[in-house]
Curated annotation (Swiss-Prot):
Known role: May be involved in transcriptional regulation.
GO molecular function per UniProt: DNA binding; zinc ion binding
Pfam families: CCHC_ZFPM2, zf-C2H2, zf-C2H2_11, zf-C2H2_assoc2
Protein name: Zinc finger protein 800
Family: Belongs to the krueppel C2H2-type zinc-finger protein family.
Low complexity bias: start-end ranges: 205-216, 456-468
Length: 662
């Protein structure tokens, strides 16, 4: 069977390629038929396709075709041009030796290559430009230059009188077109000698020096040219109709950074485009910009928002008054003497800073949709932390001094005279707690009256302490500010700030609560969500798919119970345990040693949850366990804690589980 011949299709040597084949190979018909002759071959054929071919043919040649180079001497094929050059250099040198120093312009190959490049990458037609010069009445050393094309005289471009800048303007006329047409009477088409470079530099420096002085003025400018304003590039004095165009021009042509764009933009009022109008034009700098980073904005409200969010540490006084406040609202700046600085600080603290009921910040006159957003704004922008206990307290003119001390009352006033409940044992009665708190309230009220008497607009001491009477016993009943201890969760904190954040979890307006999570299948409730999930898994034997449905509804089914429920439960357990110990010790006739009392009273109670499942509950703390061994292990923790003093246990931070009754 004869082999397929691999000769080039363009050469017709008939070495058996046209002879009949014994085994026909099905395939693409153009691969099987003879090559079709065209008027041109080789690279000339490609050039002709790019010249007169369709768009689809050009796309095929550029995108969908790879080139294979063939040496005409040895008929070797090369996929890459470097390999072909190396091959021609060492193995098949070209027949014609050409001199590189004297290239023949009329050479057909050079002409073919230039035609190919012109066909693939057509250049813009070479246009001739006319430079028209217009004199300036006020300055004899400078002229206005206008560049226009010969084919389109209506398109005119204004430029400065420097030749180097004229070349830049010629490059930009194809992309950016301006509509500034000078009067035909004042045009001078004869050649005028350009002024010296020093005068041009002085002209360019003059507007930049005037710009910082004019930046102090608050002049409203418009983005559109309909209002008679036109944007000018300070570097080349080119006019634009939009800010986007002048920014792109400065960034692309003059290679300036984004932060420096504002420095090179000016606005000019152009009532008419005559020479007198240009000479008497008013240069106005854009006023809606940030004074710190010089970033320009569309409105003054955007400047205020940018200043509050980006430059948080700075005050609004650094902005000009017309930007710092809304229209019609004056900006109050601190211009007091050093002697009165202490008084002004007190007066400033006594002023109303926010209104939680209206969700409004009184410092920057902003309203928010919720109190959470207002708290976040006060903390981020004004560095004022609002605690949850005073979330619904309104700031009226009569109680401004009292309201400014709300944050201090939670920690500092309690620190001066801590309630005795912090030093009482854990199983102390609730009645003793309230009696001790009532003893300590007069001392705290005295400290508060002293603070209120210092401010000039303070309310009466009785009115100031009236609201605190209802507030402080609740906070002190659940939290120890001196020890930084939460009695509800039995957790100790490292700082007052962490304790204050934790108090917000227990507060809902003026009420303090403890959240309990309930089991949807039984009466089991606990303070930890994961305990409910474990309870549903262990006790009710539910799958993870069921847990996925229930977990989302646990937060909705949660119950907010007052702290009296938790504190009373601890108080009620104390005497009941003592009575149980006392009765058991009498029946057994044993001694009154604490360890033996503990062992006698420490009997687990079996509680049936379902028909086939029961829990073993500890009668000390009310915890329930699935196995009796777990209950025995739990009893050992009570024995270890019984040896320690109750005060030591209270100061030490503990992480305990929920104490819910089944």
């Amino acid at each position: 069977m004869p082999l397929r011949d691999k000769y080039c299709q363009t050469d017709h040597h008939h070495h058996g390629c046209c002879e009949p084949v014994y085994i026909l190979e099905p395939g693409d018909p153009p691969l099987l038929q003879q090559p079709v002759q065209t008027s041109k071959s080789g690279i000339q054929q490609i050039i002709e396709c790019f010249r007169s071919g369709t768009k689809q043919l050009k796309h095929i040649l550029l995108k969908d075709v790879d080139t294979i180079f063939e040496c005409k001497l040895c008929r070797s094929l090369f996929r890459g041009l470097p390999n072909l050059i190396t091959h021609k250099k060492f193995y098949c040198p070209p027949s014609l030796q050409m001199d590189d120093n004297l290239p023949d312009v009329n050479d057909k190959q050079s002409q073919a290559i230039s035609d190919l490049l012109e066909a693939i990458y057509p250049r813009v037609d070479k246009r001739e430009y006319i430079i028209k010069l217009e004199p300036i009445e006020t300055n004899q050393n400078a002229v206005f230059q206008y560049i226009s094309r010969t084919d389109n005289p209506a398109e005119v471009t204004e430029s400065s009188s420097t030749p180097e800048q004229t070349e830049v303007q010629i490059q930009e006329t194809s992309s950016e077109q301006l509509k500034a047409v000078p009067d035909a009477d004042t045009e001078v088409e004869e050649a005028i000698e350009p002024p010296s470079i020093e005068t041009v530099v002085d002209e360019a420096a003059a507007p930049t020096e005037e710009q910082p002085q004019e930046s102090q003025a608050d002049l409203e400018t418009s983005d559109s040219s309909d209002l008679g304003h036109q944007l000018i590039c300070c570097l080349c004095r080119k006019e634009f109709n939009s800010r986007r165009g002048v920014r792109r021009h400065i960034r692309k042509v003059h290679k300036k950074k984004m932060e420096e764009l504002k420095k090179y933009i000016e606005t000019r009022k152009t009532p008419n485009q005559s020479s007198k109008g240009r000479s008497k034009s008013v240069l106005v700098s854009l006023s809606r910009s940030c004074p710190v980073c010089c970033k320009s904005f569309a409105t003054k409200a955007n400047v205020r928002r940018h200043f509050d969010e980006v430059h948080r540490g700075l005050r609004r006084d650094s902005i000009t008054p017309d930007i710092a406040t809304k229209p019609g609202q004056p900006l109050f700046l601190d211009s007091a003497s050093p002697k009165k600085s202490f008084k002004t600080r007190k007066q400033k603290s006594s002023k109303a800073e926010y209104n939680l009921t209206a969700c409004k910040c009184l410092l920057c006159k902003r309203k928010y949709s919720s109190q959470i957003m207002l708290k976040r704004h006060m903390q981020i922008v004004h560095k004022i932390t609002l605690s949850g206990a005073n979330s619904k307290r309104e700031k009226g003119p009569n109680n401004t001094a009292n309201s400014s001390e709300v944050k201090v009352e939670l920690a500092d006033s309690v620190e001066s005279s801590p309630p005795s409940i912090t030093h009482s044992p854990q199983n102390e009665l609730k009645g003793t707690n309230h009696s001790n708190e009532k003893k300590n309230t007069p001392a705290t009220q005295k400290n508060k009256v002293k603070q209120d008497s210092e401010s000039p607009k303070s309310a009466s001491p009785s009115a100031a302490g009236g609201q605190q009477k209802t507030r402080k016993p609740k906070l002190s009943a659940g939290f120890d500010f001196k020890q930084l201890y939460c009695k509800l969760c039995k957790r100790q904190f490292t700082s007052k700030q962490n304790l204050t954040k934790h108090i917000e979890l227990h507060t809902d307006g003026n009420n303090i609560y403890v959240k309990f999570y309930k089991c949807p299948l039984c009466t089991y409730e606990t303070r930890r969500k994961r305990d409910v999930i474990r309870h549903i898994t262990v006790v009710h034997k539910k799958s993870s798919r069921y847990l996925g449905k229930i977990t989302a509804s646990l937060e909705i089914r949660a119950i907010k119970k007052p702290i009296d429920f938790v504190l009373n439960k601890v108080a009620k357990r104390g005497p009941s345990r003592e009575e149980a110990k006392h009765n058991d010790s009498k029946q057994d006739g044993t001694s009154n040693s604490p360890s033996k009392k503990y062992e006698v009273a420490d009997v687990g109670i079996e509680v049936k949850v379902t028909k086939n499942f029961s829990l073993h509950r500890c009668n000390k703390c009310g915890k329930a366990f699935a196995k009796k061994t777990y209950l025995e292990h739990h009893k050992k923790t009570h024995k270890a804690n019984a040896t320690n003093s109750p005060e030591g246990n209270k100061t030490k931070g503990r992480s305990t589980r929920s104490k819910a009754l089944v």
